[in-house]
Amino acid sequence: MNAFFTPEGFYRTAGYSVKWLYGLAAVCAAVAFYLGFFVCPIDATQGNSYRIIFIHVASAWMSMLIYVVMAVFSAAALVTNNKMCSIFSAAMAPTGALMAFLALFSGSFWGRPTWGTHWVWDARLTSELFLLFLYLGFLALQSAIADHRRADKACAVIAIVGVVNVPIIYFSVKWWNTLHQGASITSKGSSIAPIMLYTLLLMVVAFWIYSFASTFVRARSMILERERRQTWVQALVKEGK
């Protein structure tokens, strides 16, 4: 486990798993798509338009989870000064931004037949949009500061301060009178049909595995860039790996 949190150890270990992770994510997503669009029954209230939730909810959950994990790694980086914690946080940001955008984009397609408009300044939608801006701000700051050490510290502040927005997104439908529907899955059970629940959870697993794979790919690329003067990286370059 300690080797996993060193640049060389992670680079070598993660390289073996990326293809398998992408493959597993593709299989899970394909099965979830089939179940969601061809097997799950038509909803009595929303008709077929509800099927977008399998993408919308999965991406929204992942956008929040990724940001929380980024904040944890950012805090760990400031406390321990571990290189890999900063790399993990930065490597997750593009996927988190993609998930936040996908949640908003797919939600607009669901909102048109349900609310009569693609967008409303609802508390949950607005806080999710703010989450996307946090991701974009993190990425912009990471690119704007040439010294990656200074960039990591500045971005860590954004990640840690911005994490307060995550519970706002989650509890917005309880704290305010919003158009967005409440949670269909709670600690007391689920209000949707079992086949819909299983399909949604499978899509979440697919997005979760994809996020792992994408983070691994970016982290390995960042390691090569930051550790390019190390002998083990130069040896890899000579070997064509």
Located regions from the model:
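Polytopic transmembrane helical bundles with strong interfacial aromatic enrichment
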Residues: 1-241
